[in-house]
Amino acid sequence: MKTRDQFTALFESIDFEKIIDHPNILIAANFWDNERYCAARTCYRFMRALDDLIDNHKAAHQGISMDDRESFTSEIRHWMGMLDRQMNKSPFNNELGYTVERFRIPLWSLEYFAESMLYDVIHDGFATLDDFIEYSIGASVAPASIFVHLAGLQEHDGVYLDPPFDVRRTAEPCAMFSYFVHIIRDFRKDQLNNLSYFADDVMTRHGLTRTAMSEMAHGAPLTPGFRAMMREYLDIADCYRADTLIIMDEICPKMEPRYRLSLEIIFELY
């Protein structure tokens, strides 16, 4: 079981400039002014640190033991305390608190994200599709909402004002579309890392089991049930894609060109 000092040392050792797995948010944010880009990078660093610690542990240990669950849970609660700059002394803690305050980052987004990480620690996969969708609000919609919030901020005399639209409603369809695409695209990679994002009830409906999914990821022939399940997930993703197009038409006229472009880039990357 890792100690808090070990977790902190690992966190500080991560070179966030070299993250290459899923850089879409920061690729798109490069079109912003530097201050907003740095704000996105700070929030992304916070979220990516939590996500990577948990996923890497699962990949290395084929799950999370009860002792490690307690340690991870403690760390997630501790990191949520970073938002109080008065209680934290490290430069990064202060940077995160400053960013949240300066850019009016909605606290619910960070809280929902942390809750999804707690779900990852406590649970092994998803019993139902509804469980996965609820989890996705924290794991995908929350980070996307921060991105949309930063892109939609209105600046007046050096002060940032909230976007002129509902950030969560705007972010949700594109975030869900991209997340479904992500789990379909990365099925084999996730399985090989002991990660499973496909719901048990959907697998059962198509005559699949977790064991069968793992076997196919390791090279066994794909079954008709597997292909049917993937089509079902693609249909769900396509519904979110259609909703995204509607939302984009609504909000794009309210945004400056460079920030509108960044949203379009995120969508097109998927």
What are these regions (language model features)?
Residues 1-178, 189-270:
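Catalytic cores of Mg2+-dependent Asp-rich isoprenoid enzymes
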